[in-house]
Amino acid sequence: MNKIAPAEIASMLNDWYLAIKKHEVEESSRLFEEVKPLLDDMEEDQEVLAYFSLLELRHKVLLHEARGQGFQHEEPSHMNATSDMLKYYFFLFEGMYEAYKNNYDIAIGLYKDAEQYLDNIPDPIEKAEFHLKVGKLYYKLGQNIVSLNHTRQAVKTFREETDYKKKLASALITMSGNFTEMSQFEEAEAYLDEAIRITSELEDHFFEAQLLHNFGLLHAQSGKSEEAVSKLEEALQNDEYARSAYYYHSAYLLIRELFKIKKKEQALSYYQDVKEKLTAEPNRICEAKIDILYAIYAEGGHAETFHLCKQHMDDLLSEKEYDSVRELSILAGERYRELELYKEAAHFFYEALQIEELIKRTEVI
């Protein structure tokens, strides 16, 4: 049997790469299934194999971002390619994977390594993608100004390219998230409104559910819990979204807002739904977060729940969920202060301050 020329496989990989860049989930999945079995029949070429391995990781990241799928990754044994472009992709994709695992310092180091080769990448979309990934990481770390600086560069490029509307919408969501955290709610809503206009043209209902979650987050942060609950419940009506890992983010936020507006029965109903789901699909992070909410709201936040809350906070710290610990520490502190349990309140407020200092020490690109 004749071997397939590496150039033929490389051409297919370029088509796959373009689908990934455009955030075309179904097309990316189709091309992955088409090209993977052909590698066994290809003439040996380490550069093409390395290119495939890097695109496979980026495809997994796309499925996580666009459909909430988890993934595992092992560094390929044939990563001995020498071109600057492959080195760039290697550091970028490995950084994306470490960010997914909440290994922030490692991710930032890998992004810095990738940045050394960025000037050698002629594609403006690829440069915009780099800035968007870095912007999302710093948003997750609560370093909003740094995140905005990177994300603005991505928005500028994606606005100029009509084939990358979903990427533009994704960047706009990150812009909105930063302004939400900075309590600049009008700016945040304007970016989300633009994103929803773009999304309505794409007919991607999963992405629409993600946007609804972000509207819920915006309303929650601006003190409009009723509106937040409405948007979050609407997001969870999308069956595919409700089956994805993003379900846990929306369910947690929904339970939190229901407790805040004293709709205890509804909050407990969702709490039980999540607990049942967790028996089949364990998620240590979500379980710790909703159990903290249960302890401080449903059980009254009395002194006996303090050690339980502390234990769950430690679980979140072990998973490097720093932003969650900061947020929940403030909630717990406020709750214990309301109950005049000042020693317990002081502990959690101090915990929030420690996390703030930890995040500030994170290296900046």
Swiss-Prot record:
Superkingdom of origin: Bacteria
Record localization: Cytoplasm
Pfam families registered for this protein in UniProt: RapH_N, TPR_12
Family annotation (PROSITE patterns): TPR (PS50005), TPR_REGION (PS50293)
Signal peptide from the UniProt entry: none
GO CC, alphabetical: cytoplasm
Activity regulation note: Inhibited by PhrG.
Induction: Part of the rapG-phrG operon. Expression shows a slight decrease in stationary phase. Repressed by RghR.
Matches recorded under InterPro entries: O-mannosyl-transferase_TMTC, TPR-like_helical_dom_sf, TPR_rpt
TPR repeat residue intervals: 135-168, 169-202, 209-242, 244-284, 326-359
Keywords (A to Z) from UniProt: Cytoplasm, Repeat, TPR repeat
Gene ablation phenotype (knockout): Disruption of the gene results in the enhancement of aprE expression.
First-listed, main subcellular location of the protein, grouped into a coarse class: cytoplasm
Keyword Repeat: yes
Family, similarity comment: Belongs to the Rap family.
Free-text function comment from the UniProt entry: Involved in the regulation of expression of DegU-controlled genes. Inhibits the binding of DegU to the promoter regions of aprE, coding for an extracellular alkaline protease, and comK, a master regulator for development of genetic competence. RapG does not stimulate dephosphorylation of DegU-P.
The name this protein goes by in its record: Regulatory protein RapG
Organism: Bacillus subtilis (strain 168)
